[in-house]
Amino acid sequence: MKMISTILHWTCDPISASMASLLFRWAIALAMLPYGVQKLFHPENAAKFPKVLFFSPKVGYYSAAVIETFVPLFLMAGFLTRLAVIPAIVSFTIATKVTIGKDLTSPALPYLFGLIAIFIVGSGLYSADYWLLYLLSNN
């Protein structure tokens, strides 16, 4: 019984939840970052980028490059986390629509669901958001 109590306490502990949020933010950010950096350093691939909505392939390519480079940096720092993931959610929703297969799979889906989870959960205690809120509430 003591073991069950310990496990339940550990899973409901705000410190543990914040640590899980930190690890999840870093996992998504580190998985996204290489794609953004690759797009920034290889602009010749912009011509192959699909035209989406009313944007030219170049505009779509560079906006995806900026989003996929800077959103992970914001996620790793936990800075403006919920605000930062909004453009990434839009970008990965568009990427999912463009790349969805007949079997309803897309390489963008795991990122999209991860970003939505981060938007819902927030940044947690181990983030710049927490410390900004702490500093602003004490003044």
Regions found by a protein language model. Name each.
Residues 1-44, 48, 55-66, 70, ...:
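Extended, low-polarity transmembrane helix blocks
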